[in-house]
Amino acid sequence: MAHADLATEQSLRSEIDRTDHNRRQIRGWLAVVLFALFALVIVGGATRLTESGLSITEWKPIHGVIPPLSAEEWEEEFRLYQRIPQYEQMNKGMTVEAFKTIFWWEWAHRLLARSIGVIFALPLLFFWLTGRVERRLRLPLLGILALGGFQGFIGWWMVSSGLVERTEVSQYRLATHLVIACLIFAACMWIYRGLSPHTGDAAPTQRSQTMAGIIAAMSLFQIYLGALVAGLDAGLSYNTWPLMDGAIVPGDLFVQQPAWINLFENPKTVQFLHRAGAYLLFALAFAHMVVSLRAASGTTHARRSVLLFVLLTVQAAIGITTLLLQVPIVWGVLHQAGALVVLGFAIAHWRGFVGEYPRPAAIEVRH
């Protein structure tokens, strides 16, 4: 009997060790994916801020990997760009050399996006075929892969909105493109954190997990509002802080009809909403931190709540500086990077309350 129990325990320990080993490998893979996604969003922000997103006027998922290699090919690519309204109305007289600058930004963004597809799909196939992907993760990972493929279509759908009548892409499509990218990033972070060892600290209060989820959701919503701000160049509407046009609430927020359209197409209203959302998010994070410190100051959850508030404070300072400086490229990119850092940490913090995915046996492991 004792021998049988020992054999069972050894078998169980072997299974746990194998699970831990597989999880470390998948976490390493997801860490690379997260880094690549972060880089993609940053390059995408720089592409937008340099007004380079419309420089490639065709969608060639495979052939588009190869850039122009000869003077003739560059001339042909430039001729395609000269057909769209952005060239006619904004860049008339641009040289081929100047065109190359904006072309390389968009090409790099598309190449990085394609590369992430490979970075995600091939290791996933390997882990799947070798039995390293736990059953509970199969559908979520396939969902992320499918969403990534759909994101490629959304990217072209966004670009196409600026090729016919407009000199820029639709703010609605820009927001959709950025939010989907952030959803993919958040989903990868959620799984990555769920595969990581957790402490056994109890939540500071019964509502701590709910509040962490609200902060994460609000962080994503702020990114959506930020995308509308970017698409409308709303960051140039009021370049003062804390007042807007000398008032807390400016008077021309609902000048368009119907009134609801101002929420999406009035640059001043959209900037006001982005500011208001930032204040709300800041207040929620501050309250969450205070409650966590009072209820359980020595826990990992409380320490994470402090770091989350610090990250939000830094992001707010970057946002205000970006506004006051009238959105220079470096600060605009830094603000977008900060938003993704806040979102990623908010997701990880929220997942910390949920805990890691169950193991083959109920054994607490703390690293």
Curated annotation (Swiss-Prot):
Record: residues binding heme: H274, H335
Enzyme class: oxidoreductase
Cited Pfam families: COX15-CtaA
Residue ranges of the TM segments: 26-46, 111-131, 139-159, 174-194, 212-232, 276-296, 305-325, 327-347
Catalyzed reactions per annotation: Fe(II)-heme o + 2 A + H2O = Fe(II)-heme a + 2 AH2
The entry's keywords: Cell membrane, Heme biosynthesis, Iron, Membrane, Metal-binding, Oxidoreductase, Transmembrane, Transmembrane helix
Record keyword Metal-binding present: yes
InterPro entries given in the database record: COX15/CtaA_fam, HemeA_Synthase_type2
Enzyme Commission number(s): 1.17.99.9
Pathway linked to the protein: Porphyrin-containing compound metabolism; heme A biosynthesis; heme A from heme O: step 1/1
Listed cofactors: heme b
A Gene Ontology molecular function term of the record: oxidoreductase activity, acting on NAD(P)H, heme protein as acceptor
GO biological process: heme A biosynthetic process
Location (main, coarse): membrane
Compartment(s) where it occurs, according to its Swiss-Prot or TrEMBL record: Cell membrane
Lipid bilayer topology: Multi-pass membrane protein
Cellular component terms per the entry's GO annotation: plasma membrane
Protein's job: Catalyzes the conversion of heme O to heme A by two successive hydroxylations of the methyl group at C8. The first hydroxylation forms heme I, the second hydroxylation results in an unstable dihydroxymethyl group, which spontaneously dehydrates, resulting in the formyl group of heme A.
Subunit structure: Interacts with CtaB.
PANTHER family attached to this UniProt entry: CYTOCHROME C OXIDASE ASSEMBLY PROTEIN COX15, CYTOCHROME C OXIDASE ASSEMBLY PROTEIN COX15 HOMOLOG
Recorded family membership: Belongs to the COX15/CtaA family. Type 2 subfamily.
Record-given protein name: Heme A synthase
Gene name linked to the record: ctaA
